[in-house]
Structures are given as C-alpha cells and as structure tokens.
Amino acid sequence: MLDECVNWRFLNELPEYTVKTVRQMGWSGLKNGELLDKAQHKFDVLITTDKNIKYQQNLSEYDISVIVLDVRINDLEHIQSLVPWLKESLLLIGVYDIKIIKETKINKLVSPQCSNS
C-alpha cells in the first residue's frame, strides 16, 4: 500500500504487485497508528516517504512491514529513481520488517543505501 505522502502515480511502477493507495482505500487523513492498524489486515507492506514513522510508531505492534523511501525531494521523479531497490526490497523484506532506501546524490549511477532498522 502507498502512503498518502507518496505520489499516487508511483503505483504504476509496480505492475507486478497489487498496490492500492491510502486514498483508494478511503483512509485519507488517518493518523499513522490508525492507518497501520487498518492496513495490517489487508496489506503486507506500507511504502512511505515518512522518515519519522519508525520514531512515531512502535512498528512491532503491527503485522505489516514498512519500506521508507528516503528522498531529498518528495516528488515522482525522485521516488522513481529508487524503483530497482524498492523491488529488490519487496522480494527480500521480512515479516514485520522496516527497510529504509536512502537516495544519494548520485543515485542514478550507484545503488542507494538500503538498510534495515
């Protein structure tokens, strides 16, 4: 599922997955805790650009994994540059895991930093 802070057009980058946006689910405006509570029953992974989610929520309380796209500018072009590493992370992510894919200044030339938290 794509968080509200991720451009909805980004779902077109993941045609091999069933991806919904928060808005499509009718969950716009929910606080992160409420969103995670609802999402854990319908989705395996939440994709977000909210770098603070791991500090604001106790993610171990939810049955959902989280991937944070840590971009300098939160626009479609910048998050699209992370697609190869996002797809790799989706294949490797564990249950209840959080991964951070960090954009680098030369992210188009080298792999961005990808870390578990």
Question: What are the functions of these language-model segments?
Answer:
Residues 1-42:
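N-terminal first-folded block
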Residues 66-109:
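C-terminal structural segments of small proteins and small subunits
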Residues 2, 23, 49, 69-70:
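A secondary-structure boundary/capping signal
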Residues 19, 59-71:
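A short alpha/beta connector and helix-capping loop motif
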Residues 39-59:
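Acidic, metal-binding active-site segment of PIN/NYN-like and related structure-specific nucleases
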Residues 25-26, 53, 72-74:
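Short histidine/acidic/glycine/proline-rich micro-motifs that form metal-
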Residues 35-37, 81-85, 115:
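Short, surface-exposed amphipathic charged segments that create phosphate/polyanion-binding patches used
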Residues 11-12, 56-58, 78:
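Short glycine-/acidic-enriched loop or helix-start segments at secondary-structure transitions
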